């Protein structure tokens, strides 16, 4: 604890195991607490690393696994956005993560007027469903 906000979050998610979709020695695939959208996923290293591209095949394998699980549950090619958040060269005080946001719902008046997202699927339920997918 105390290494970084993302590091602390990953450590707590690994400890609780409620929202984990898949995990290995190097990385973890999580349905994040307070997800903005149904079936949102976050891939992060279990130990802080600055760049995704330097972390070996584990992260890529878990990302592939998560996308496969989403496709099995939501249909062969669910619409989604994917962000790779990785440090620029030379920056070491950073921890990579990848966010996957399936586009299953439409923004309506409440979301647009208040900037509040309504997620109709609890992340714990999403994780359980995707673990079985």
Explain the meaning of each model-derived region.
Residues 1-133:
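HIT superfamily nucleotide-processing domains
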